[in-house]
């Protein structure tokens, strides 16, 4: 996975595509717990302590109102680890009543992971294509000399 990471463009794409289907705010946090994509653009750049819990514990974390009051940058909802090749690369959060979101959470997470995998594969294909072009250019230059 070297050379690939979850970026703000991909995070915002996940948010936009998901929020067209589900009527709730979506946040995407990077591997350091920072919000890098959100339906609430004012939250982008904030540290999300709920995401830090997901990253450190490697599991789904439900946040109710009582917990949200004690954590920084957190609202009631559910937070799920985003995995790529078994490694947690970020967190996806759905804002709202955890009990109501649980049924959507896994589906949203699976869809986001599929988008991440597709992006990673496209990156690898582009890299492979560049390496092939470079090899051909080197062979042509070697023949000219």
Question: PLM features: what roles do these ranges have?
Answer:
Residues 68, 144-145:
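Short intrinsically disordered, low-complexity coil segments enriched in acidic
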Residues 2-17, 96-143:
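Juxtadomain coupling helices with adjacent low-complexity linkers
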Residues 2-74:
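Structured interaction and signal-relay segments at domain junctions
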């Amino acid at each position: 996975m070297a050379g690939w990471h979850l970026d703000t463009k991909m995070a915002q794409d996940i948010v936009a595509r998901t929020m067209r289907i589900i009527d709730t705010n979506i946040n995407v946090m990077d591997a350091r717990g920072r919000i890098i994509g959100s339906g609430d653009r004012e939250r982008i750049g904030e540290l999300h302590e709920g995401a830090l819990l997901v990253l450190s514990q490697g599991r789904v974390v439900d946040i109710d109102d009582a917990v949200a009051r004690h954590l920084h940058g957190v609202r009631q909802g559910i937070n799920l680890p985003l995995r790529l090749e078994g490694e947690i690369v970020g967190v996806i959060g759905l804002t709202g009543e955890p009990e109501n979101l649980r049924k959507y959470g896994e589906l949203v997470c699976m869809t986001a992971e599929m988008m991440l995998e597709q992006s990673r594969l496209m990156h690898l294909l582009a890299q492979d294509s560049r390496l092939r072009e470079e090899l051909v250019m080197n062979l042509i230059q070697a023949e000219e000399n």
